Amino acid sequence: MSKPSDRINLTNQFLIAMPNMADPTFSGTVVYLCDHSERGALGLVINRPTDIDLESLFNRIDLKLEIEPLLHIPVYFGGPVQTERGFVLHEPVEGANYSSSMSVEGGLEMTTSKDVLEAVATGTGPKRFLLTLGHAGWGAGQLEEEISRNGWLTVAADPRIVFDTPAEERFEAALGLLGVSSSTLSGEAGHA
């Protein structure tokens, strides 16, 4: 049994699905880990845009989005847990105090309250953000077990991949942080 001090904290890391990922929900995904502790882990898939854009989502929740460049930004599938709930991964906004926000070690924030969307709609919210429906969640020890079975690679997250890289390039970009590409990655691995 490992001591709490022996635990690896994967908060603010990317999880990159290995080619042998059996769960189609996560096949080919990059997950940004917002929280990882002895209680479990919570993350957001950052490379699965849905066919819903910000304009239609905002209309659905009775908000008027008036910033033209934002209208057709896609909403992402964040994971299979709470898929009707919005999660906004964003850079901190100076002076903002959203009612349900969590600072992620490393500089980003994740907010689940409607006030961040109200701020986005009026142009006073975060300038760089990613909105997902749903999140990925793991119980105590579950993620560590999946990693030990070679289900995931991990690497320190880079906000430029989250906010500046096109969705279809994020998987390769995250792998690039490790110096590998999907063409050189094998689903087979050994343990010494």
Swiss-Prot record:
Matching InterPro entries: AlgH-like
Cellular component GO terms held in the UniProt record: cytosol
Any single Pfam family the record assigns to this protein: DUF179
Family statement drawn from the similarity comment of this UniProt entry: Belongs to the UPF0301 (AlgH) family.
This protein's name: UPF0301 protein Bmul_2524/BMULJ_00714
Higher taxonomy: Bacteria, Pseudomonadati, Pseudomonadota, Betaproteobacteria, Burkholderiales
